[in-house]
């Protein structure tokens, strides 16, 4: 989801917009939703999307509010619609017109207080009246579709987001239309809940993280650098969300005591792992779920938020993760272990023997051609020693399809010291890989990986002496872009990473081992 690039719009520029959209493509995004709570972007935005092949989901500029349709206001809106439809309609990147952001849903439920999994007990945000409902129907289900049909008949009109097709017909039905899924995050459910849903299309979902330390330093004095300080909480769009980040963090990682920088790093891993958990699940179920748009791409000021790129253009861990989990050909793993246990804190004799541990690999292919790949996996311990070699299998995945491999039971795996490494190769080149734990990261017994690196030209070579999870490689200004970052590394492996932009000065690294 694309939001305004700056709170002061004249500070944006075509060059800045191009860079942002190029970075979206670099992370394998193929669609950008122009959010209805922002503004209609400049012509330059659409020109760049045409050039880069990005499909635009274009909201009309209405979000999260009711509008009273006086004759004068309706006349003003009609002029606005005519102007923007005529301006945008000729762009090859335009894929969809959407009437508004979340207004059908809010009207249907009578405000946030009455939405599912938001039992606040507060009164609705507004009292629905027949006139308000009539105004909604007239604007989004009569005026707008009629105007789009007259001025841009070849482009599809969708009445709202989320929606099941309009007419207040259960706009959040996961079996039809699109869904904004916020039970994870706003509803405080664990991110493992993503696997309980197979939506048709997820047009908005997200998970917050703090920006990097250099960005925090841009709006704080040293005495403000505590996430519960006045300044840090005011640089937070979502009320009390710094506390929410810490609640989720405590469910997943150990408490970071090594300083604010480590806490910020941990929050970014939390966000990235949560989104990976959801997207990979939906990609494995291609055919049922046909798309996911991450909330959000960018920020309009330096802030803790759902973005994958912060205000200054620094990539968070999520953006690097997106590059991997949105890759055209993806190998992913549906594991069973501690997170799948319906009662992981139950009294039992031995958690290792009483918990089912298994993996089931899946290759998803978003290209227009069949893809033949070789899949390999190993069960390894925290020293990267191979405990069980899964061998290799060659499979062909049809175009725009997925292929499941057989489930493998791993009763011998120690959930506190073992992990599975899996990789996908094509023509001898590794094109997708990751690792999976059977416990939450805070319970895994990491060994100091003794990370080291050297620079050769425009490349960095990173190595480890033990299994390293989510290796972060930053320069002094924390502003470079690498070909890969926040990756898993096995002992003895050398990871060669190209420097896309930025200087290799003051390189520092860490992994989940350092969250302590």
Language-model features: where?
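C-terminal accessory/binding modules appended to enzymatic or scaffolding proteins
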Residues: 446-491, 495-500, 512
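Terminal connector regions
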Residues: 362-363, 403-449, 502-516
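Intrinsically disordered, low-complexity Pro/Gly/Ser/Thr-rich segments with frequent PxxP/GP/PP motifs
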Residues: 378, 382-418, 478-504
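Active-site neighborhood of glycoside hydrolase catalytic domains
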Residues: 51, 67-166, 270, 312-313
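Substrate-binding clefts and catalytic carboxylate motifs of secreted carbohydrate-active enzymes
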Residues: 104, 139, 146-371, 389
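Active-site-adjacent substrate/metal-binding segments within catalytic domains
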Residues: 1-65, 73-96, 233-272
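Hydrophobic faces of well-ordered beta-strands that scaffold small-molecule active sites
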Residues: 1, 32-34, 56-58, 99, ...
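Short acidic, flexible loop segments centered on an aromatic residue
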Residues: 366-385, 464-481
